[in-house]
Design a protein with these regions (language model features):
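Long terminal segments
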Residues: 1-23, 27-32, 38-39, 45-48, ...
Length: 116
């Protein structure tokens, strides 16, 4: 059963770049590009491409690719890659790069690390 609404991702110019519906990730044309099942991340063909471990995200080799600390997104090396402020998404230099509508921080980090 799907959710009552889709959660949407927009770029900095306001164009919709994707959406998430019931933990399935879609691109701007509506094509499914991946999904999350429990703590495992899959691409559109069903191949495991990552996993979630608490606030950490790992690639298919098990290497940490990022983590969330509050509203801040960090790379595996600890560099701040971005932050979320309300519905706005900023890169590491503070420039707004997009907007999320109804997405949790973990959904945003999954979208950016695996599907962009």
């Amino acid at each position: 059963m799907g959710s009552a609404f889709s959660q949407r991702m927009y770029d900095s110019s306001g164009l919709q770049i994707g959406r998430v519906d019931s933990e399935r990730y879609y691109d701007s044309s509506g094509r499914q590009i991946g999904r999350v099942d429990g703590f495992t991340i899959y691409d559109a063909s069903g191949r495991q491409i990552g996993r979630i471990d608490g606030n950490h995200v790992h690639n298919s080799s098990g290497s940490q690719v990022g983590r969330i600390d509050g509203e801040r997104l960090y790379s595996a090396s600890g560099t701040q890659m971005g932050r979320i402020d309300g519905d706005r998404i900023y890169d590491g230099s503070g420039r707004q790069i997009g907007r999320a509508e109804g997405l949790r921080p973990m959904q945003i980090i999954i979208y950016f690390y695996f599907f962009m």
